[in-house]
Amino acid sequence: MPSFDEALQRVGEFGRFQRRVFLLLCLTGVTFAFLFVGVVFLGTQPDHYWCRGPSAAALAERCGWSPEEEWNRTAPASRGPEPPERRGRCQRYLLEAANDSASATSALSCADPLAAFPNRSAPLVPCRGGWRYAQAHSTIVSEFDLVCVNAWMLDLTQAILNLGFLTGAFTLGYAADRYGRIVIYLLSCLGVGVTGVVVAFAPNFPVFVIFRFLQGVFGKGTWMTCYVIVTEIVGSKQRRIVGIVIQMFFTLGIIILPGIAYFIPNWQGIQLAITLPSFLFLLYYWVVPESPRWLITRKKGDKALQILRRIAKCNGKYLSSNYSEITVTDEEVSNPSFLDLVRTPQMRKCTLILMFAWFTSAVVYQGLVMRLGIIGGNLYIDFFISGVVELPGALLILLTIERLGRRLPFAASNIVAGVACLVTAFLPEGIAWLRTTVATLGRLGITMAFEIVYLVNSELYPTTLRNFGVSLCSGLCDFGGIIAPFLLFRLAAVWLELPLIIFGILASICGGLVMLLPETKGIALPETVDDVEKLGSPHSCKCGRNKKTPVSRSHL
């Protein structure tokens, strides 16, 4: 009885049909990148704003001031190291204290309102609302007043998105295994579109946050299921390069995003531009089939056979009647637990290091991306260049992992990222070209580390625990994404370069730890926990090759 992989070889492992489906699904990586890093442009800090009290508003109306005149006459002067253009952002003069009458503003002069106070010194009070922006509604910061005491809410928007990713990984990942890949993919695309439109027209901040969370849930569903569909309809030899190329389309999304943001002047327009393409993916219902491998495991052999024949026809192949019964091996394991991943020494070491690697990759990668929004300079050009820098990372991975193995490039990429972050933090601001060059190396390093951890994670777990182990460890990626914005923005408020030091320390430690992982180059995938325990031993090359494990057979 032929296996599914043998049938796939017969119909073509990466023929015209697979290439078409692959290209269509790769576009999901572009839109997922929009969602993943879009906060950099949605939440851009306004250049010019100040706190406007009720008396200042009334006085501006009476005197007929322009916004600039109002700012010059009523905003408190800068104090300490604060630059002049930031005057009056988080404090305001209590102009209504000029006298105790109801018409306090009548005592204030249009030429010099502060002259009504002794020594021209009006009382200062913290701003609790009423900010005025030079460009109202241009970003979510000005839309929902996410400044001063409310600045932490901007961090919350990205943390909530990552919480949605984490939720989607478990809920929609399970649903895709139970109800089908393409069904969940299409539902997720619809969910991303609907929730994204609601986000764009959210009447208040709570509604914005709730639907941004839901968009994260569905967004993770599109990314996971498209990745699984592609890897399940191509041959085993193509899976590695297919996985890397999909991530290159994610990078393509990062490159395209600044162009979209540059030509659209407000955050609602940007949100719609990065959301509406998800509705186009619903057309895939007619061109992207269900995974035939999944159909066989769900005892839906007739449908799987129809799809295989469709693939064969498109690829110019022929599936003979000998393939009327096809088997696929299912992992015979039920209810795996975290204890299975830490019970034995080698499994425990691999699990803890991989969890830290996922966490570090997410924190450093997202931190470096979002940092572009707070360091000044031309955000659009800087963001575009940072995206272009990621493209060589995939090429370097393809050139090194089969020659040098997994462990050395994995460690080197983390160490390069860590050292680059530390060096950038202490370079003088006057040599901008050198700071940019070193920071670029750091971005390239962490991009490579992020892509390699996907591969290494799957190669270090046995068949019976692979899906569960990868899901659990990669969950630390989303957890890192929840922490990253708070870590970046709050530490940057203390010292702009402090987040870089934290990122550098984390990545450097990770680079050292991954050298403790066993090398998996040229070694068959482990099938049991015993195989994992033997990795790194002189006989590890035999792991997973001659062992037999109980399997259940699903057939056509």
From Swiss-Prot:
GO MF, any single term: organic anion transmembrane transporter activity
GO biological process: cellular detoxification; dopamine transport; dopamine uptake; epinephrine transport; epinephrine uptake; histamine metabolic process; histamine transport; histamine uptake
Primary site of residence: membrane
InterPro entries linked to this entry: MFS, MFS_dom, MFS_trans_sf, Orgcat_transp/SVOP, Sugar_transporter_CS
This protein's GO CC annotations: apical plasma membrane; basolateral plasma membrane; endomembrane system; membrane; mitochondrial membrane; neuronal cell body; nuclear outer membrane; plasma membrane
Topology with respect to the bilayer: Multi-pass membrane protein
Family as reported in the entry's similarity comment: Belongs to the major facilitator (TC 2.A.1) superfamily. Organic cation transporter (TC 2.A.1.19) family.
Protein name according to UniProt: Solute carrier family 22 member 3
Organism whose genome encodes this protein: Homo sapiens (Human)
